[in-house]
Amino acid sequence: EIGAIANEYGVPYLLDACQSIGQMSVDVADIGCDFLSATGRKFLRGPRGTGFLYVKQDWIERLEPPLIDQFAANLLDEKTYLLRRDARKFENWERYFAGQAAFGRAIEYAMDFGLPKIQQRIFKMADKLREGLQEIPQLEVTDQGRLKCGIVTFRHETLDAATIKSELARRKINVSVSSGSGSRLSFMERGIESVVRASIHYYNSEEELEHFLSKIRQLVA
């Protein structure tokens, strides 16, 4: 819907897909975006410091990178340079070669496993986790939206998110705390200070899910 509106009025549309790439199928043609960026370190399980940028062909021709080195363009004479004609004109000569190779392997791994299978598994497990959390007294699952993914967020009426995180860490369970820096208006509107964030992936088992829920029950009892 956003892509259709943006395209109708000629508004450039950049989509941050960091949380989507690697856990579900993403099609830039269906989305209608002009640009799409994503990181390698999240659901793709690639190295930190890696990522990629998609640029629609007509925008490649219209834009010039803010910084140009000998990779993005060829210097023809002392006053003239010739930019590359593909999206690699936005890259730099110096690069993280080891990370780039590992990132490529992470992408191959996900593609070999199959993104539809990955999405089905992640969404199924995340739904189970939400159901289990909703059964715990004084605990609220805070996820919204028509399509709920593998990122599960919740809060407790009396225990703050930071305390829950530290107590779970003592029990060798890793979660994170979201304080709303990326969704400040939504948090303010809903009266939320912070939430606990538990991310599910396809390699998580039902036994691990139940172990997590049992520790939450013990913690808030």
Question: What are the language-model segments listed below?
Answer:
Residues 1-221:
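Pyridoxal 5′-phosphate
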